[in-house]
Amino acid sequence: RINGTMLPADRWPVLADRVMEAAPNLTYFEFLTALGLLAFAEAGVDLVVMEAGLGGHYDATTAMPVQAVCFTPIGMDHEKILGPTLTDIASDKSQAMRPGVPAFTAPQEAEALDCLLRTAQEKGAELRETASLPFPQSALGLAGPHQRVNARLAIAVWDWLADQHHWPNMPETAAKGLASAHFPGRFQRIPACNGLPPLILDGAHNPHGLRAFETAVRDADIQPAAVIFSCLADKDISDMLPFIRRIAGDAPLFVPTIQDNERAMNGEELAKLLAEGRGPAITQPTQRLSLALKETASFVPAEDADRHPVLLCGSLYLLGEFFNLHPQTLEQ
């Protein structure tokens, strides 16, 4: 996205050809990182925010110089690559720090914070903790209490960058930005339209994300009419199952198999695991997401539908499949 607008479809192949011509042997994420940087350079942007894809030691985003490094709350994910413990994961992520470059962190579990502090000392980076800063009092465009934690981190980094570059930094402008923030697939509400039931989309695909999603659902007083969930086979599903069962409650739970992804977990196998302990509640596998969406529509009540939407959560690849089916929902 550049200034909140998705990169036009016709620019992707043009930029991709230039990257492939210059560096034909890049990995997938190296390729996407290079393509993004090329797009940003052509647009002449003043500020780029890049999200690491996997850890911080060997992630493609570490190839570029940076002015600041940010750590949102670190949780369990990608254990097969980064390691089986939170310390392993935090140690890898901490390698994103650079000598002399300030690093900002949201509140962390004790072992994760220890890793960040140790690496900061080893690399000569100043680690700035944001836990003691006040929460932004303005309304947020992104739902859930965890987004206030993220917003506090974003404001801390922005204040520092604005001071360094002598950019205008008016509180009312920051408040407007927080209120208008939009992130597809992060507690994203989609009203009933074009045959779709009312939906809330969330890319929660690990225990850390599902805990935040569960809290956001509860705080919004949402009682789902149905839930659609799926994930990749290389995820540690055992720690995610209790969250999905609690989020769904007695509502029907539909489990599609993510299409065109060799890492996708089979919907029937995942449904069997999720059905354990759900009693008579419906837990039904479907061959694909489009079928699950059709099935869930009949469970949405005619009245108070906003309080009883269908929750679509899990793998970002599942959400990607949804956005391919309904591209108009990507925009705010």
Where are these regions (language model features)?
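Short, high-confidence coil segments that cap the C-terminus of an alpha-helix
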Residues: 24, 45-46, 222, 305-307
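ATP-dependent carboxylate-amine ligase catalytic core
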Residues: 1-64, 82, 110
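Nucleotide phosphate-binding/pyrophosphate-handling subdomain across enzymes
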Residues: 47-50, 60-62, 66-70, 74-75, ...
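Conserved catalytic-core segment of NTP-binding enzymes
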Residues: 54-58, 65-123, 240
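Active-site-proximal loop/hinge segments that shape catalytic or ion-binding/gating pockets
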Residues: 315
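C-terminal helical cap/extension that packs against the catalytic core
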Residues: 106-128, 198-200, 241-309
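Flexible, gly/pro- and Lys/Arg-enriched active-site loops
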Residues: 56, 60-63, 74-83, 255-274, ...
